[in-house]
């Protein structure tokens, strides 16, 4: 077999001279031995410590024998739904089944179950009644305590209870999984391993649980959503390894779920060690017949520079999963990996990304964090940058220069998100210049998300004027270096706090830019985010103030349609939304109008009214090619033409 992949069959296990593995890793993803995949990191890390690990990727959950490939492991089963929550992987925000799965050979959908951690855990428990089962990965991490589940529209128990598992290793997991392995290897019964940071365990009593904060019981959470809001905020304040408390969630008089404080962040040396493990950097060769695993295309020639994020966006789960303290790899580690990438036969000279959750975070936000942790009730960037913020891109600029100098490297792109408020806080502008000159290919995607103040505040995003200043500096810099490059803003509709009034405000912004996004992301209530808590409870858990929440599919469709008001297929929704918002003044023929009146449709005045009908024989404005693209400037053209996008930001921003 090509390469040194870990065994996926009993025959491969026997071929290594093993009679038994120490751990069996069951994954909802296909086996891809690349450090962008959690199963690759954890299994390689265990291998480096001398443990024997076998992998069962995407077992048939309808057949108990599918998890019996290696027999009973000596120490336990490790279970993960994969790189994504299985429900996000399977369903769009409208709860429609997705057609493809990028983490499955050939992109085939349906190779993992819904709520994969629960299903896999119970499947294993059917056969192996006493074998330890440890859950990990993002699905288990974000469902580790009672949580709102958008897809069933219910409050669910901790996944630890419903899966039949013994322990959850939450967060990134390197520290906790090694401690768990060592404890099991020492013969400690799994029910007695209750003390490891970064784990969640079950307890029958609180006699041996010390220094814990007791959360509302599950019954209390179900009885009153305000209890859930308060409980969630307590959890939110305890996501830091330096000052996080042990939390206890009661389920009955004899059943408690105990969350130990988070594991400590990795040091730079530990980060380097993790990413220097002998990954094959591709999918298992057994998938070749199906065309491989699509997800590899996005990450095969990318470098993971950091983890953790102090951005604090309310709709992002990173605070609960990776934490707010940024951890980074050394230049030497990244350069070594880049050199390995250049040896790949498919490498064309382009490194696709050097980043992580946020590309331009290359050190903790302030000097005190690695000793005292993050501030519990204050954010580093919101509502404005903290006075102690260390906004400095010199290390990142130096790294990017070294990567550009590697032989065979033609260009280094940055595709991870750029936090523009942090960029502006660095007054040197050195990074902005290098970003525009070397690391953008015509377009830079950024995420202002919205323009309305109340919505941005609930999102944890900077005021809109900050984004306006960034656009001004971006275009000024491009003019200075003689380049024509554009910003493409990501926008979100239907976030908590967004009424039709705020949605109209966002539509007017798009009108003033002369820009209609081809895709708009509806807010997606995924487990364990502040925004999801707002969606479920109707309050901001930080203040307990009421928040308007657009929930009906029809209102969400109206909010989305307003942003894409030029799409003829959405005309009726736009008209209805404008009437309901009391903004009928935007229906007409004036330069500020979004659409023309219904009674004169077909009059030939579309352009004047700010509404463009498709010409005869052309297709709607849903991202497909039109016969006359000149009428639709600002859109990415068809695949048979060179991709381009005009400057969607008005010239006033370039002053």
Question: Can you say where each PLM-predicted feature lies in the sequence?
Answer:
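Conserved SAM/AdoMet-binding glycine-rich loop
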Residues: 25, 56, 60-61, 340-488, ...
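N-terminal pre-triad scaffold of radical SAM enzymes
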Residues: 26-29, 290-317, 342, 350
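Glycine-rich beta-alpha loop elements in corrinoid/cobalamin-binding modules
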Residues: 38, 57-252, 259
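Terminal amphipathic helices with adjacent charged low-complexity linkers/tails
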Residues: 62, 191-240, 254, 263, ...
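Flexible glycine/acidic-rich beta-alpha junction loops that bind and position SAM and/or redox cofactors
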Residues: 85-94, 142-144, 174-179, 204-207, ...
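Amphipathic alpha-helical packing elements
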Residues: 159-171, 272, 561-605
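Conserved, mostly hydrophobic/aromatic
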Residues: 166, 274, 309, 334, ...
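Intrinsically disordered, Lys/Arg-rich low-complexity segments
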Residues: 602-655
């Amino acid at each position: 077999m090509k390469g040194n992949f870990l065994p996926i069959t009993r025959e491969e296990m026997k071929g290594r001279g093993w009679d038994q593995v120490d751990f069996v890793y069951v994954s909802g993803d296909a086996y891809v031995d690349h450090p962008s995949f959690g199963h690759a990191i954890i299994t390689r890390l265990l291998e480096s410590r001398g443990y024997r690990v076998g992998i069962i990727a995407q077992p048939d959950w309808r057949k108990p024998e599918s998890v019996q490939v290696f027999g009973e492991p000596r120490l336990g089963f490790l279970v993960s739904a994969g790189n994504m929550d299985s429900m996000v992987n399977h369903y769009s925000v409208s709860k429609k089944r997705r057609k493809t799965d990028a983490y499955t050979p050939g992109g085939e959908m349906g190779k993992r179950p819904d709520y994969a951690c629960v299903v896999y855990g119970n499947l294993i428990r059917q056969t192996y009644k006493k074998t330890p089962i440890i859950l990990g990965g993002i699905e288990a991490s974000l469902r580790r305590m009672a949580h709102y589940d958008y897809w069933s529209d219910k409050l669910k128990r901790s996944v630890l209870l419903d899966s039949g598992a013994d322990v959850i290793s939450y967060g990134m997991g390197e520290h906790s999984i090694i401690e768990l392995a060592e404890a099991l290897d020492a013969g400690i019964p799994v029910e007695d391993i209750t003390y490891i940071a970064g784990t969640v365990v079950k307890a029958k009593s609180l006699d041996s649980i010390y220094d814990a904060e007791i959360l509302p019981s599950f019954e209390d959470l179900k009885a009153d959503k305000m209890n859930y809001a308060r409980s969630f905020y307590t959890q939110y304040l305890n996501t830091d390894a330096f000052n996080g408390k042990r939390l206890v969630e009661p389920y009955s008089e004899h059943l408690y779920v105990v969350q130990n404080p988070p594991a400590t962040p990795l040091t730079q040396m530990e980060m380097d060690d993790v990413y220097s493990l002998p990954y094959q950097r591709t999918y298992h060769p057994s998938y070749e017949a199906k065309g491989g695993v699509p997800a590899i295309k996005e990450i095969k020639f990318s470098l993971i520079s950091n983890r953790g994020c102090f951005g604090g966006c309310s709709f992002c789960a990173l605070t609960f999963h990776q934490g707010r303290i940024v951890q980074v790899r050394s230049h030497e580690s990244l350069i070594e990996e880049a050199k390995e990438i250049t040896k790949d036969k498919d490498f064309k000279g382009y490194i696709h990304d050097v980043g992580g959750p946020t590309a331009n975070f290359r050190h903790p936000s302030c000097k005190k964090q690695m000793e005292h942790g993050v501030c519990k009730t204050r954010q580093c960037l919101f509502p404005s940058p903290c006075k102690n913020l260390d906004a400095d891109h010199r290390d990142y600029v130096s790294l990017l220069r070294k990567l550009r100098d590697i032989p065979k490297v033609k260009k280094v792109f940055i595709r991870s998100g750029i936090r523009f408020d942090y960029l502006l806080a660095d007054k040197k502008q050195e990074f902005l210049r290098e970003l525009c000159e070397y690391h953008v290919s015509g377009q830079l995607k950024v995420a202002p998300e919205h323009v309305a103040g109340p919505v941005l505040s609930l999102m944890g995003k900077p005021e809109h004027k900050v984004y306006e200043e960034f656009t001004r500096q971006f275009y000024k810099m491009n003019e200075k270096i003689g380049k024509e490059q554009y910003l493409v803003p990501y926008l979100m509709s239907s976030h908590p706090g967004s009424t039709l009034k705020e949605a109209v405000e966002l539509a007017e912004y798009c009108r003033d830019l002369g820009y209609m996004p081809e895709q708009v992301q509806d807010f997606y209530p995924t487990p364990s985010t502040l925004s999801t808590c707002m969606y479920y409870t109707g309050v901001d858990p930080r203040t307990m103030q009421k928040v308007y929440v657009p929930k009906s599919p029809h209102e969400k469709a109206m909010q989305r349609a307003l942003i894409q008001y030029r799409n003829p297929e959405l005309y009726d929704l736009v008209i209805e939304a404008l009437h309901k918002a009391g903004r009928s003044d935007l229906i007409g023929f004036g330069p500020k109008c979004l659409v023309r009146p219904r009674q004169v449709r077909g009059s030939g005045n579309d352009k004047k009214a700010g509404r463009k009908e498709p010409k005869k024989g052309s297709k709607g404005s849903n991202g497909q090619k039109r016969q006359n693209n000149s009428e639709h400037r600002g859109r990415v053209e068809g695949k048979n033409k060179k991709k381009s996008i005009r400057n969607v930001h008005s010239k006033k921003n370039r002053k």
